[in-house]
């Protein structure tokens, strides 16, 4: 089967927004107008097509990006293929947004006309900047009380530091919102609000004529700056034609020089069709964005893969989902080449082969089987065994590793245990499945307590995962409070001379060791033997090292593992009959226990490197709060229109920080933290910890 749509007629885009900007409703309308949906699902009925996980339908928020393919006939009468990725708008799911932005070519940022640019819009916008994604803005909910298009446009500049390019103006607002002025065609488009009705094209209302002229002039001035020839012609008094103007806006949008702004109300069906036309006219096709970079596995040099069916096959797995009917589905974006059912591909990140069995084209939650797919397509693959998010699948003869996605480290850990014996086995399976789907969720076993620890991006993130475990895997679990992993070390040198003797009829046990224990700068354990003259035979020395290592897992203060200890064996004695490796092991164990006490044992805590990105208004509060958490500020710097505060803070004082930061900055600041080093715990705090764990 040959390709049905030319790659130039593809638009791979997503809709990004703050949690309540109406994203799901907008996606529903797009699917309706492009002919895929026959009954529109409303979010507030919990019946929306894109939000297909049960929790999403209950909470009315979008958690999982579902990919959907649909089609739209543009103004020129030509049909285009849209691949739409739905992205979540909640801060605990930013990983999902990062993932989808990574594989998109363009995006529509949705704003609530009443609230304008909200905190999560800033976060997602910054992520899109990082991947250099061309964006348009749609000011939604123009029918809402307090809707203000002009304020929203101003906020795109002041809050996002972006160049706004209105290509429409609203006619009326709140209850009186009826349509828009098209600043390119200089016509009024109005809708009567019935579902699916086309716009009525008419003249611009007299009271808006001057404003429309003023905004069109600004539009042309910004657009011609993109192209020298157009700029020269404009300065000589030649206006661009409407088609030339569209071409200039397209060029500037794709180069991320400015962002076209449109408006409407998805819920009331006003302004949706012009937005779809704008996707065709202003957002890039896969061939309009730079070719994806990667590393050639054979030569280990940088290479690129062009968006072409003729290039070697390369694709990036960007999402894994459990589908109730098909099992595990891997969503992948094909960047180059052609994919056929039944072929065997190389997973270059894992170094494993994968056979492509079943290939699906997804519509929100229905699916169609396909036999082949091409560059630019987004497909769902069933039954891949080894592939996880961020892996590359490619032609085994031309292996490449495409740019890896970067996933933030989890910031919150809690212990989890099955409620009953029956839940025990199921819990392990469920947690491993969830971790395969979500790279920002980690599972580990705590060697010290034997508990299972889960870690994620925030409290809502872990809540939802525990909830999914209950629903999808029928596992009931108890969840504990967040915990810190402390360590112990020593502060000075101590020399210990210890003899182990045991006589119990027949051969006994004898070993004498003389060891110096001292602190060193690293975190590891160093063992050295300075035995000369055979006072401890060579074959017994490994027993000395093994004995010390076996007790370093539990320090003398509160039973935490020990770090940064050096042990030097300087002397000893043995007995021809009674000595053995085991005897030396026992002697060195006892010597270490005595030495750790004498060498000034101390408690260490993990110190986190914290970076807070905040609007300037909240810098003082953020710094004050970090200081109150025993944090040390290492500096501040400007990043765009935000300020970055860097600090070192003990992990023990960072629990619940996401919520304090949210309320302190009205949700506009965000933070990341990662482990940096261990540091001694202040005496007063150490005493409390010892009491608790002793």
Curated annotation (Swiss-Prot):
Q: Which residues bind GTP?
A: 17-24, 86-90, 140-143
Q: Give compartment(s).
A: Cytoplasm
Q: Does the keyword Aminoacyl-tRNA synthetase apply?
A: no
Which keywords fit this entry according to its UniProt record?
Cytoplasm, Elongation factor, GTP-binding, Nucleotide-binding, Protein biosynthesis
Signal sequence extent: none
GO BP annotations listed = ribosome disassembly
| Classification via PROSITE patterns | G_TR_1 (PS00301), G_TR_2 (PS51722)
Matches recorded under CDD domains: EF-G (cd01886), EFG_III (cd16262), EFG_mtEFG1_IV (cd01434), EFG_mtEFG_C (cd03713), EFG_mtEFG_II (cd04088)
**What Gene3D superfamilies does the annotation carry?**
3.30.230.10, 3.30.70.240, Elongation Factor G (Translational Gtpase), domain 3, P-loop containing nucleotide triphosphate hydrolases, Translation factors
Q: Which GO terms describe its cellular component?
A: cytoplasm
Main localization (coarse)? cytoplasm
Q: Which SUPFAM superfamilies match?
A: EF-G C-terminal domain-like (SSF54980), P-loop containing nucleoside triphosphate hydrolases (SSF52540), Ribosomal protein S5 domain 2-like (SSF54211), Translation proteins (SSF50447)
Q: Which InterPro entries does the annotation name?
A: EFG_II, EFG_III, EFG_III/V, EFG_IV, EFG_V, EFG_V-like, EFTu-like_2, G_TR_CS
Q: Name one GO molecular function term.
A: GTPase activity
Domain tr-type G stretches: 8-287
Q: Which family does it belong to?
A: Belongs to the TRAFAC class translation factor GTPase superfamily. Classic translation factor GTPase family. EF-G/EF-2 subfamily.
Q: What does this protein do?
A: Catalyzes the GTP-dependent ribosomal translocation step during translation elongation. During this step, the ribosome changes from the pre-translocational (PRE) to the post-translocational (POST) state as the newly formed A-site-bound peptidyl-tRNA and P-site-bound deacylated tRNA move to the P and E sites, respectively. Catalyzes the coordinated movement of the two tRNA molecules, the mRNA and conformational changes in the ribosome.
Q: What is this protein called?
A: Elongation factor G
Q: Which organism is it from?
A: Brucella canis (strain ATCC 23365 / NCTC 10854 / RM-666)
Give the organism's phylogenetic lineage: Bacteria, Pseudomonadati, Pseudomonadota, Alphaproteobacteria, Hyphomicrobiales
Q: Which gene encodes it?
A: fusA
